[in-house]
Amino acid sequence: MAYAIIETGGKQVRVEPGRFYDIELLSAEPDEKVTIESVLLVQNDGEVTIGQPLVAGATVQGTVLRHLRGRKVLVYKMKPKKKTRKKRGHRQEITRLLIDSITFNGTVLTAPTASAETADATPDTETAAE
């Protein structure tokens, strides 16, 4: 299983092709393709490449699924004995991003197809009868 560590929105996220992730708001419309070039690490078949600070020639392609808002975080400030209280809420804007592929040195790493996974999961009838 191939994966990469990218930096987006001031955070580092471990991403795999075929999965979706909630990241900081991107200025892209839903169903729009985005390319992330700030790749810090790429792992493919046990071979790990670490960038200093970025991996040269590595990009991550994804599709914006939708924009949403995160859970509400409540901030409560109070001064004792003064009857001063402030209660504020904040909801972070989030983009749900589906990772399509990871490109590294001209090699495109994508998610395994569903037909290959089901073929591996199907029990062999000859060995099951024994």
Swiss-Prot record:
Asked if NAD is a keyword of the record, the answer is no
Which parts form a coiled-coil structure per UniProt? none
Q: Which branch of life, at top level?
A: Bacteria
The alphabetized UniProt keywords are: Ribonucleoprotein, Ribosomal protein, RNA-binding, rRNA-binding
Q: Which GO terms describe its cellular component?
A: cytoplasm; ribonucleoprotein complex; ribosome
Q: InterPro entries recorded for this chain?
A: bL21-like, bL21-like_sf, Ribosomal_bL21, Ribosomal_bL21_CS
Name one matching Pfam family: Ribosomal_L21p
As one GO molecular function, the record gives:
structural constituent of ribosome
Q: Does this entry carry the keyword RNA-binding?
A: yes
Q: Biological process GO terms, please?
A: translation
State the function annotated in the UniProt record.
This protein binds to 23S rRNA in the presence of protein L20.
Homology family = Belongs to the bacterial ribosomal protein bL21 family.
Matching entries from NCBIfam families are given as: L21
Its subunit composition reads:
Part of the 50S ribosomal subunit. Contacts protein L20.
Q: What is this protein called?
A: Large ribosomal subunit protein bL21
